[in-house]
Structure formats: C-alpha cells, structure tokens
From Swiss-Prot:
Matching SUPFAM superfamilies: PRTase-like (SSF53271)
Name by which UniProt lists this protein: Orotate phosphoribosyltransferase
Membership in a protein family: Belongs to the purine/pyrimidine phosphoribosyltransferase family. PyrE subfamily.
Primary gene name: pyrE
Signal peptide stretch: none
EC number(s) given by UniProt: 2.4.2.10
Uppermost EC category: transferase
Biological role stated in the UniProt entry: Catalyzes the transfer of a ribosyl phosphate group from 5-phosphoribose 1-diphosphate to orotate, leading to the formation of orotidine monophosphate (OMP).
Upper lineage: Archaea, Methanobacteriati, Methanobacteriota, Methanomada group, Methanococci
Keywords, ordered alphabetically: Glycosyltransferase, Magnesium, Pyrimidine biosynthesis, Transferase
Gene Ontology biological process terms in this record: 'de novo' UMP biosynthetic process; pyrimidine nucleobase biosynthetic process; UMP biosynthetic process
Length: 176
C-alpha cells in the first residue's frame, strides 16, 4: 500500500471525518467536519504526514512554516524528518517580550514552504503567506493534509502559491 492510501485509511480509522451540522473557521456551514486534531495528535499519522511532505522538499533549500496552533505539530514533524529549519506563524503577535508574529529565524530571501492541516477557502493560510512575504520570505508552495475543495486552491493561485493537498475530502469520503 502506498503512503497516500495508508494516510487515507488511517484518517478514516481515527474518525477524522464527522457528519452533522458544523460552522467552519471560514464561517461557512457544513454537513461534515474534518476533525484533523485526531490526526495531528496521533504519532503514526503525524510521522506519515511528515514523511510524505519531507520526501517532496528534501532537495530544496527551504524553511518549513506552520500556522499556530493546528499545523505546528505537522510543521514540526516535517522539520525533523526533512532536517529543515522550523518557523511558527502566530495568528496574533505576542503582547509581551519580542512581540514577534513569526517565531524562528526568517531572513530576507528565505524560501519557505507552509504546511496546513485543513483548507476550505484558504483564508487562514493566505494570512500566513502574507505575513511571511511581508517579513522578507518567499512562499510559492503550501502543503495541506486535507483540502475541502471549496476554493483554497484557486484563492492561493491568485497569489502565485501552489496548494498541494496530501488528500482531498472526496478521497476521504470515498468508500474504498
């Protein structure tokens, strides 16, 4: 079994997709919810996700960024497996100390790959792209564990960023 099929099976096994009435981070209503925390707190899934992304960036001179809180475990796994420096993008700057919005060393011209847990419209990850770019980083790629196929890919393309989903919601909903 290839790694993608294994990931799909594991996501289903731990109950990452739930049905009912839900309000998403984007404000949209949905009849299903991707409970990705069931994956990002599972060591087997986290390692597998880290390996899949690390394989795709191993030959690139990049830093790996995760947006607090959901994608930080993923970014950490990728960083360790790929041996790439880690950045953490805060949603709001700290109100004490350095007041940084980006943790880790980001220098002008650094190439950064962002990892995300779930995308719907891409709004959250677009804020991270903007923040990294405003601080001198170059972002043209975002990896996401699950894409809900509701506009994130298109919205990121408008900003010259490629969205690379490990799994789409269609694949997760299919009954293999």
């Amino acid at each position: 079994m290839d790694k993608k099929s294994k990931l799909i099976n594991l996501l289903k096994e731990v109950g990452c997709i739930r049905f009912g009435e839900f309000i998403l981070a984007s404000g949209k209503k949905s009849n299903y919810y991707i409970d990705i925390k069931k994956a990002t707190t599972n060591p087997e899934i986290l390692k597998l996700v880290g390996e899949i992304i690390a394989e795709q960036i191993k030959d690139e001179d990049v830093k790996v960024a995760g947006v607090e809180l959901g994608s930080v475990p993923i970014a950490t796994a990728v960083s360790i497996i790929a041996q790439k420096p880690l950045l953490i993008v805060r949603k709001k700057p700290k109100d004490y100390g350095t007041k940084n919005k980006i943790e880790g060393e980001l220098k002008e011209g650094d190439k950064v790959v962002i990892v995300e847990d779930v995308t719907t419209t891409g709004g959250s990850v677009l804020k991270a792209v903007k923040e990294i770019r405003e601080n001198g980083g170059i972002v043209d790629k975002v990896f996401v564990v699950v894409d809900r196929l509701e506009g994130a890919k298109e919205n990121l393309q408008k900003e010259n960023v490629e969205l690379i989903p490990l799994v789409t919601v269609k694949e997760l909903q299919s009954t293999q």
